[in-house]
Amino acid sequence: KKLKNTQSLIVSSLKQETLNSVVISFEIPPNFKKQYAFKAGQYLTLSANIKGEQIKRSYSICSSPKSQNLQVGVKAIENGVFSNYVNDALRQGDSIDVTIPEGRFVLENSASANYCAFVAGSGITPLMSIIPDVLENNENGVFVLGYGNKTKASTMFSSTIDELKSKYTNRFFCYNIYSQ
């Protein structure tokens, strides 16, 4: 049974983000662009038939609303049926059921707002939508991020964060904390 407000979307690309995580990009048909418009911080629920069982999981959107891309980051977890399916079996060109964006983890951006966030591991995914959105829409805003991971190699979105630090030199600061 299909979830409410769901369309079958084509995976336009799968990017290996770290050894055990991928970023999925979805192709949005022109007639569904409006339904799949999103606010930074929202999430999607993906649904797939895995070994005869319909499994669904929610993942935060990790692309900026201005980017015109709809992407989620998925980290494989031990015994995670859906996350391992996505990381090991899902391919570019495959179709997967995706709900329209939902959720209220969104910022009401104000012209003078400064932000600070602390995240660990794959908890970074909604912020990969929120941070660029804040910096693009608030020319005076500052965003400070404390980001915990096991190792540099296991850090999701490391290169994107480096690009943001270069682009917004005096406005975006990321402090990485490694446990190993």
Language-model segments: what does each one mean?
Residues K2-S95, A113, N149-T151, D162, ...:
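Ferredoxin-reductase
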